[in-house]
Amino acid sequence: MTISLKDVEHVAMLARLKLSDEEKEMYTKQLNDILKYAEQLQELDTENVKPTAHVLPIKNVFREDKVHQHLDPEKALANAPEREENFFKVPKII
């Protein structure tokens, strides 16, 4: 698989990026270099390699939940431009 100049131009258009001709050429070359490296990785023999999610043996470390003093609702809402009961009122965005 290779990346063409047209592919780079299409992605730049989707991302709303204005790229110079030199940048388009540079990104095309860099992306193709990355793909060539990924193809080299595909050639590795992984037949006897055990599948892992992480190279180090890691387990989740959880902490105990502790109750802490919290901010009083009146203080939290003191500088709110608008509020409704004990909630911040914000403009509808959808």
Curated annotation (Swiss-Prot):
EC id: 6.3.5.-
Organism taxonomic ancestry: Bacteria, Bacillati, Bacillota, Clostridia, Thermoanaerobacterales
Catalysed reactions, as listed in the record: L-glutamyl-tRNA(Gln) + L-glutamine + ATP + H2O = L-glutaminyl-tRNA(Gln) + L-glutamate + ADP + phosphate + H(+); L-aspartyl-tRNA(Asn) + L-glutamine + ATP + H2O = L-asparaginyl-tRNA(Asn) + L-glutamate + ADP + phosphate + 2 H(+)
Family from the record: Belongs to the GatC family.
Keywords per UniProt: ATP-binding, Ligase, Nucleotide-binding, Protein biosynthesis
Disulphide bond pairs: none
EC main group: ligase
TM annotation in the entry: none
Gene3D superfamilies: Glu-tRNAGln amidotransferase C subunit, N-terminal domain
Subunit structure and binding partners: Heterotrimer of A, B and C subunits.
Function text: Allows the formation of correctly charged Asn-tRNA(Asn) or Gln-tRNA(Gln) through the transamidation of misacylated Asp-tRNA(Asn) or Glu-tRNA(Gln) in organisms which lack either or both of asparaginyl-tRNA or glutaminyl-tRNA synthetases. The reaction takes place in the presence of glutamine and ATP through an activated phospho-Asp-tRNA(Asn) or phospho-Glu-tRNA(Gln).
UniProt gene name: gatC
Gene Ontology terms: biological process: glutaminyl-tRNAGln biosynthesis via transamidation; regulation of translational fidelity; translation
GO molecular function: asparaginyl-tRNA synthase (glutamine-hydrolyzing) activity; ATP binding; glutaminyl-tRNA synthase (glutamine-hydrolyzing) activity
Name the UniProt record assigns to this protein: Aspartyl/glutamyl-tRNA(Asn/Gln) amidotransferase subunit C
